[in-house]
Design a protein with these regions (language model features):
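Helix-loop-beta segment of a Rossmann-like dinucleotide-binding subdomain
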Residues: 80-90, 103-104, 110, 116-119, ...
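Glycine-rich FAD pyrophosphate-binding loop
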Residues: 24-43
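Beta1/beta-strand and adjacent pyrophosphate-binding region of the FAD-binding site
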Residues: 2-15, 30
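Gly/Ala-rich phosphate-binding loop of Rossmann-like dinucleotide-binding domains
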Residues: 20, 24, 158
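Helical element adjacent to the flavin cofactor pocket in flavoenzyme catalytic cores
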Residues: 138-196, 200-207
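Redox-cofactor binding/interface segments in oxidoreductases and associated redox assembly factors
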Residues: 10, 52, 199-200
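Dinucleotide-binding Rossmann-like beta1-alpha1 core, especially the glycine-rich loop
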Residues: 47-125
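Conserved Rossmann-like nucleotide-cofactor binding loop
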Residues: 15, 37, 204
């Protein structure tokens, strides 16, 4: 049986599920997963957090732009909050105090709530710390926990409501691109045609890329 889609996404982890949800608002989408269930690998086993000051300014800016989505998700498609206040503490060893100051100078521009707390406050928050090794800690009051399973389940429910198709247990193979316009995907008992393939295969992304 051959089916046609506007987009075929390979990999039903958080990247693939997110892309599937947003694209399904205005397009016909197939989400194809090799395992027997979605979120089988890293996406289903992660303790996720929302960190405003993370990695580099570009990543931080993208993170901040996505915050409203997480905040408003309960009103859009989720019965329960996707994010909850958590707070994050980064321990500053006695040998790294100067580096902590540099870090704060860099990241406070994007996350003004960051603060250097002294050893006594850090020890009160995390009593198991070794006092002789700790100079203090950087406290991030804006760090949030993300309910990964709730997020993915909510995205998938909305994806299904939009008419999206989830195909699990399909070891998809890219066969050819006909006339430079249409990808042909062999998904075992299914044949899928699409002008656009999205590689969301995570750790297997290189394998998918080589098929193209």
């Amino acid at each position: 049986m051959t089916s046609s889609y506007d987009f075929a996404i390979l990999g039903a982890g958080i990247a693939g599920v997110s892309a599937a949800y947003f694209l399904s608002k205005s397009a016909k989408v197939a989400l194809i997963e090799r395992e027997d269930s979605w979120g089988y690998h890293a996406s289903g086993r992660s303790a996720a957090v929302f960190i405003e000051g993370y990695e580099n300014p570009t990543v931080s800016e993208l993170t901040l732009k996505s915050k409203n989505f997480f905040v408003e998700a309960t009103n859009i498609f989720s019965d329960y909050p996707i994010i909850k206040p958590l707070g994050g503490l980064t321990v500053v060893p006695t040998t790294k105090l100067d580096e902590a100051t540099v870090f704060l100078d860099r990241w406070r521009k994007l996350n003004p709530g960051l603060a250097l707390i002294d050893k006594s406050v850090a020890m009160m928050r995390v009593p198991i710390l070794r006092a002789e090794e700790v100079a203090g800690a950087i406290w991030d009051p804006n760090l949030l926990s993300i309910d990964t399973h709730q997020l993915m389940q909510s995205l998938l429910r909305a994806f299904f409501s939009n008419g999206g198709q989830l195909l699990c247990g399909k070891d998809a193979q890219l066969q050819r691109r006909q006339a430079g316009q249409v990808w042909e995907i062999d998904a075992q008992d299914l044949s899928i045609r699409t002008p656009t393939v999205i590689n969301a295969a995570g750790a297997w992304a290189n394998e998918v890329a080589l098929m193209a």
